[in-house]
Amino acid sequence: MKLYTFEVHGERRYGAELKSQLVDLPIAYTALLTARGSQPGALPALPLTLLQFIAAGEPALTAARAALAFMAKRPALPVGERATYLVEEVKLLAPIPRPGKILCSGLNYRSHAKENPNAKFLEDPRFFAKVPSVVIGHGESIRHPGLRYQVDYGVELAVVIGQAMHHATQQNALSHVFGYTILHDVSARWIEFKDNNETMGKNFDTFCPIGPCIVTADEIADPGRLRLTLKLNGQMMQDRTNEDWIFPLPRMLEWLSSAMTLEPGDLMSTGTPCGTGYFRKPQVFLKPGDVCRLEIEGIGMLENPVVAAGN
């Protein structure tokens, strides 16, 4: 199931993809209950936000699947009710506009570590944080602070936590995963590497595009065998599979949850492959007017234009 958060008629909604349309899940599920009547054990309603939906777990997913099957039959809805939209009719937002935590793995691709002359291969995964307020969605603009900041790009697979986890093991870690999305790790390298100020360099406003959707874990057979690409103005800059990971996904989740509780809706990003602009010769940095297009197989495409910060 591909799940989206979107805005329509000035209201924030969420839904799932069905035959190239978006189904408003809370409305569709209410219509299903009205048509069939309540059933033993059924949810009385779906939550109002995608974050609440994720936290509701399997009962919410079961209800959503039933709602999609109902809408596939093109039922007549009450006058004034609408549950389906074309993608062009809505504004896509970040699937989780304000995640509780955004934790990103650094130097987790062998190819990326090798292109960095100062990198050291570590015994344990390395993480940094992005703050929730820098998140934007598909189609929104990355605001460029100025050329001296050396703004760089990086495509990453992000894990969406479904069940709270603390001290997970590699054997059970994936059972806590709700799904996967695309994260664009935008960085101001001049700030990041000047005085080793990674937190500020990673957290300029708009420096964390996420989307376009969350794909539920059951649709990704092996998250460790996906192809990731990033194109800058149509030119391929990154193209790798995550078989290049240094630390596999269960190991990253085990390590991170040994220190903190990961909660429903938290994001853990798994690193970027080689091809980032800072380590190219000559270097390539983002500038106003650029367009970044990120794709991960099985998930979709995340595209964002770059504009000057004052625009």
Place the predicted regions along the sequence by residue:
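Structural signature of FAD isoalloxazine-binding scaffolds in flavoprotein oxidoreductases
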Residues: 16, 120-137, 153, 287-298
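Residue "hotspots" at secondary-structure boundaries inside conserved domains
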Residues: 94, 101, 149-151, 254, ...
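N-terminal non-catalytic cap/leader segment that marks the start of a structured domain
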Residues: 1-121
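Short, structured patches in soluble enzyme cores that scaffold and shape functional sites
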Residues: 7, 107, 130-132, 139, ...
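Residue-level recognition of short, solvent-exposed, well-ordered loop/turn junctions
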Residues: 97, 104, 137, 152-154, ...
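A generic local secondary-structure boundary/capping motif
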Residues: 4, 91-94, 115-118, 142-151, ...
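Catalytic-pocket segment enriched in acidic/His residues
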Residues: 9, 76, 112, 187-311
